[in-house]
């Protein structure tokens, strides 16, 4: 809601929201309701599992999430944003202390396969 408020204050067609399902899982009471509220200002969507790993391997309800994106006619980008190896600089910056996935190449392949069911 804060992001939508900021968009309304700026009131420019090039200003919108990037929703990140990993963070929405932490911050939002209902991910799908939040997506519906963002409908007209949703410009980009980040996907990862609840542990930042392979989508579909954890607790997030991606069937409902992607059904909601379909309901609002979202046609923008969907980007994987996984931080799966602890020994990389980005993971150090995020304080990722353990490997989420052992093989990053397999993780990308499996994630792509999973997302291709929806998008």
Task: Locate predicted features.
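Histidine-acidic metal/acid-base catalytic patches
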Residues: 1-19, 23-119
């Amino acid at each position: 809601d804060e992001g939508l408020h900021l968009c309304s204050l700026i009131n420019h067609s090039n200003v919108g929201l990037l929703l990140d399902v990993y963070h929405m899982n932490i911050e939002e009471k209902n991910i799908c309701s939040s997506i519906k509220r963002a409908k007209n200002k949703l410009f980009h969507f980040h996907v990862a599992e609840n542990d930042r790993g392979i989508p579909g391997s954890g607790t997030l309800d991606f069937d409902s999430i992607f059904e909601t994106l379909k309901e609002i006619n979202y046609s923008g980008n969907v980007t994987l944003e996984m931080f799966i190896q602890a020994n990389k600089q980005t993971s150090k910056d995020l304080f990722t202390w353990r490997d989420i996935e052992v093989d990053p190449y397999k993780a990308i392949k499996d994630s792509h396969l999973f997302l291709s069911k929806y998008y």
